[in-house]
Amino acid sequence: MLSRVVLSAAATAAPCLKNAAVLGPGVLQATRVFHTGQPRLAPLPPLPEYGGKVRLGLIPEEFFQFLYPKTGVTGPYVLGTGLSLYFLSKEIYVITPETFSTISVVGLIVYVIKKYGASIGEFIDKLNEEKIAQLEEIKQSSMKQIQDAINREKAQQALVQKRHYLFDVQRNNIALALEVTYRERLHKAYKEVKNRLDYHISVQDMMRRKEGEHMINWVEKHVIQSISAQQEKETIAKCIGDLKMLAKKAQAQPIM
């Protein structure tokens, strides 16, 4: 029975495999090594945090919902009871000592689950929450680091986009430095030219002054040389006479 199920499943999956070899009885030849191929780009559906509802700790709720329209509310229980009695009556399942051991172990497991399942579940949930908190902290830290890296990258991109302003500033600074150097040299040349012109003016003034003094001395010398002794005596006598006349006039004037 089980071999037939395996063969039917293999035959169903065979058309889906590319370049699949001939399938032998119960043998499924894989065309590639699992867990080493290219991962699919389709997003995986999120796994549920909690499992679905079950009855009797084993049978899913969907099984009962599937049988309710066909068998009614008591149908699944009647079906289970009938199958159990059928297996026992036909000796498909034979009761052995292991059966009672299994019932005892299952009962013990059920008792432990009913007694301590809630506390164990809370403990496991607490461990899970702590692990989730740690993972969330790591996630937030990673997101913060990534966001900081993104902000730094944006800042660098903004600086790169504004680099022409930096070039303009450097160009203006160079032009300003050249202008300052030009004006300093121009002022230095102006001072040198002014000093030289002042020097030439001073030389010309000194030459004129020396020439005037020399001319005055030369004229005075020749005038003195041209005056004879008789003319000097006559001039002195005339000056003395003039002084006497001025003294008489001063004495003759009444005092106010």
Curated annotation (Swiss-Prot):
Q: Where are the transmembrane segments?
A: none
Q: Which residues carry this modification: N6-acetyllysine?
A: 139, 154, 162, 221, 233, 244
Identify residues that carry N6-succinyllysine: 131
Where is it found, in Gene Ontology cellular component terms?
A: mitochondrial inner membrane; proton-transporting ATP synthase complex
For this protein, the record's Pfam families field holds: Mt_ATP-synt_B
Please cite one Gene Ontology biological process associated with this protein.
proton motive force-driven ATP synthesis
Q: Where in the cell is it found?
A: Mitochondrion; Mitochondrion inner membrane
Question: Gene3D superfamilies annotated for this entry?
Answer: 1.20.5.2210
Please give the superkingdom of this protein's source: Eukaryota
As one GO molecular function, the record gives:
protein-containing complex binding
Record keywords, A-Z: Acetylation, CF(0), Hydrogen ion transport, Ion transport, Membrane, Mitochondrion, Mitochondrion inner membrane, Transit peptide, Transport
Transit peptide, residues from-to:
1-42
- InterPro entries according to UniProt: ATP_synth_Bsub_B/MI25, ATP_synth_F0_suB
Q: What does this protein do?
A: Subunit b, of the mitochondrial membrane ATP synthase complex (F(1)F(0) ATP synthase or Complex V) that produces ATP from ADP in the presence of a proton gradient across the membrane which is generated by electron transport complexes of the respiratory chain. ATP synthase complex consist of a soluble F(1) head domain - the catalytic core - and a membrane F(1) domain - the membrane proton channel. These two domains are linked by a central stalk rotating inside the F(1) region and a stationary peripheral stalk.
Q: Which family does it belong to?
A: Belongs to the eukaryotic ATPase B chain family.
Its assembly, as annotated, is: Component of the ATP synthase complex composed at least of ATP5F1A/subunit alpha, ATP5F1B/subunit beta, ATP5MC1/subunit c (homooctomer), MT-ATP6/subunit a, MT-ATP8/subunit 8, ATP5ME/subunit e, ATP5MF/subunit f, ATP5MG/subunit g, ATP5MK/subunit k, ATP5MJ/subunit j, ATP5F1C/subunit gamma, ATP5F1D/subunit delta, ATP5F1E/subunit epsilon, ATP5PF/subunit F6, ATP5PB/subunit b, ATP5PD/subunit d, ATP5PO/subunit OSCP.
Q: What is this protein called?
A: ATP synthase peripheral stalk subunit b, mitochondrial
Q: Give the organism, scientific name.
A: Rattus norvegicus (Rat)
The organism that produces this protein has a lineage beginning with: Eukaryota, Metazoa, Chordata, Craniata, Vertebrata
